[in-house]
């Protein structure tokens, strides 16, 4: 299993791959492929739980999913995404919630959707041995403020992201997620910091890339413009279910090999 230090050593040397997973089966599949990092994202809210956004995801839901993924993954670094309002209001509560993901559920690190308010928390978590990944740019938990739109389209906001990247690095963040920002800004952030940058809709100059699993394999009904579909699992699943229904309705399933009989039961009445 790679450590945070191993991941940092990859920056600028070898592209870092990160995918989301929300259950043990998916985590096992993703882990077997050799992906470097599995993010148990609060994207589960709209990816698999049927919500319109990530805001309804609870701490207990996240904890359950993190535990499942940690049990399914043997080699990848497992990062727990801290859900909306599970951090930030009170430092002690934030630390307890983040620590729970490592101590009770088996995560290796946590991720915070970041801003000026998370710099001090990142420093404190790092001091306590809780590796922390920062997330800048489009932060879905702020959807009611910013929407799901491109971020840092102007110079002032771009400078703020660059400053926040440096501040979170200084506070001890071990990596940065950069979401839906201009590629040339992401390149400048990557150049400005010594910790890995992992992009999603942020161009190819980041040290790594992350996407949502359901987008990658083609399970999502719709995907953001920066996602790429590499398979059609939704279609394959639908085909398999159609075949199952046809087999049951036609009497082809179950076959004799799918059940057993006991001779002594033949004379029951």
UniProtKB/Swiss-Prot annotation:
Keywords: Coenzyme A biosynthesis, Cytoplasm, Magnesium, Metal-binding, Transferase. Its cofactor is Mg(2+). One of its GO terms (cellular component) is cytoplasm. GO terms for molecular function: 3-methyl-2-oxobutanoate hydroxymethyltransferase activity; magnesium ion binding. The keyword Repeat does not apply. Residues 250-269 are annotated as: Disordered. InterPro entries: Pantoate_hydroxy_MeTrfase, Pyrv/PenolPyrv_kinase-like_dom, Pyrv_kinase-like_dom_sf. Its EC number is 2.1.2.11. Binds 1 Mg(2+) ion per subunit. Residues 252-262 have a biased composition (Basic and acidic residues). It catalyses: 3-methyl-2-oxobutanoate + (6R)-5,10-methylene-5,6,7,8-tetrahydrofolate + H2O = 2-dehydropantoate + (6S)-5,6,7,8-tetrahydrofolate. It comes from the Archaea. GO terms for biological process: coenzyme A biosynthetic process; pantothenate biosynthetic process. 3-methyl-2-oxobutanoate binds at residues 42-43, 81, 111. Pathway: Cofactor biosynthesis; coenzyme A biosynthesis. It is found in: Cytoplasm. Mg(2+) binds at residues 42, 81, 113. The active site is at residue 179. The keyword Magnesium applies. Belongs to the PanB family. Homodecamer; pentamer of dimers. Catalyzes the reversible reaction in which hydroxymethyl group from 5,10-methylenetetrahydrofolate is transferred onto alpha-ketoisovalerate to form ketopantoate. This is 3-methyl-2-oxobutanoate hydroxymethyltransferase. It comes from Haloarcula marismortui (strain ATCC 43049 / DSM 3752 / JCM 8966 / VKM B-1809) (Halobacterium marismortui).
């Amino acid at each position: 299993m790679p450590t945070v230090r191993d991941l940092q050593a990859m920056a600028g040397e070898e592209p870092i791959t990160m995918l989301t997973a929300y259950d043990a089966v998916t985590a096992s599949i993703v882990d077997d492929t050799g992906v470097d990092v599995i993010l148990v994202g609060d994207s589960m809210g709209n990816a698999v739980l049927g919500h319109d956004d990530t805001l309804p995801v609870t701490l207990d839901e996240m904890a359950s999913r993190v535990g499942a993924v940690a049990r399914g993954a043997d080699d990848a670094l497992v990062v727990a995404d801290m859900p909306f309002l599970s951090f930030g209001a009170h430092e002690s509560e934030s630390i307890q919630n983040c620590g729970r993901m490592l101590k009770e559920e088996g995560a290796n690190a946590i991720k915070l959707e970041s801003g000026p308010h998370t710099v001090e928390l990142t420093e404190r978590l790092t001091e306590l041995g809780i590796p922390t990944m920062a997330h800048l740019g489009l932060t879905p938990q702020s959807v009611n403020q910013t929407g799901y739109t491109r971020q840092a389209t102007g110079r002032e906001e771009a400078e703020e992201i660059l400053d926040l990247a440096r501040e979170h690095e200084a506070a001890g963040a071990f990596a940065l997620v950069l979401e839906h920002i201009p590629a040339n800004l992401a390149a400048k952030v990557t150049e400005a910091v010594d910790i890995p940058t992992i992009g999603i809709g942020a161009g190819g100059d980041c040290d790594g890339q992350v996407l949502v699993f359901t987008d990658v394999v083609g399970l999502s009904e719709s995907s953001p413009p920066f996602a790429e579909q590499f398979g059609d699992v939704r279609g394959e699943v639908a085909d398999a279910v159609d075949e199952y229904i046809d087999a049951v309705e036609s009497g082809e399933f179950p076959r004799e090999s799918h059940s057993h009989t006991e001779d002594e039961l033949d004379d029951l009445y």
